[in-house]
């Protein structure tokens, strides 16, 4: 289905970020870098940048696919720590059909719960 293809497209890109994160973890614990604090700091910086890039990719994916049932799923799964106001912007951008879907409703409930917890 169209949604399955969108999810596969998203997962393909995210898996590259995950692989890169694993590479950084492996490099961080490589014996030849363990005693080199400059190298360790550089690896940590690259690792943090990779996390930010994945997060930004996820946000962009959601914002650029408001007509996909995958968008609210990705928002709940990967950008749940986003500011509630931004999640609200994401939700309002969804098409009515997507907003009324299982994950659209779950996203709305999550936002409402977060707002009431503030």
Where are the regions a protein language model picked out?
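A non-transmembrane, solvent-exposed segment enriched in polar/low-complexity residues
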Residues: 1-46
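Sec/Tat-exported extracytoplasmic proteins
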Residues: 14, 18-21, 25-28, 54, ...
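Short helix-to-loop capping/linker segments positioned immediately adjacent to catalytic or ligand/cofactor-binding
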Residues: 29-31, 58-63
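Short amphipathic alpha-helical coiled-coil/interface segments
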Residues: 40-58, 91, 111
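Charged, long alpha-helical assembly modules
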Residues: 56, 63-118
């Amino acid at each position: 289905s169209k949604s399955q293809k969108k999810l596969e497209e998203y997962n393909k890109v995210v898996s590259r970020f995950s692989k890169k994160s694993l590479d950084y973890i492996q490099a961080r614990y490589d014996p030849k870098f363990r005693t080199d604090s400059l190298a360790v700091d550089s690896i940590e910086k690259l690792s943090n940048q990779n996390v930010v890039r994945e997060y930004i990719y996820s946000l962009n994916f959601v914002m650029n696919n408001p007509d996909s049932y995958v968008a609210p799923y990705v928002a709940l799964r990967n950008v749940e720590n986003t500011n509630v106001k931004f999640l609200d912007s994401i939700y309002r951008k969804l098409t009515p059909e997507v907003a009324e879907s299982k994950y659209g409703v779950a996203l709305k409930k999550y936002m409402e719960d977060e707002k009431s917890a503030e």
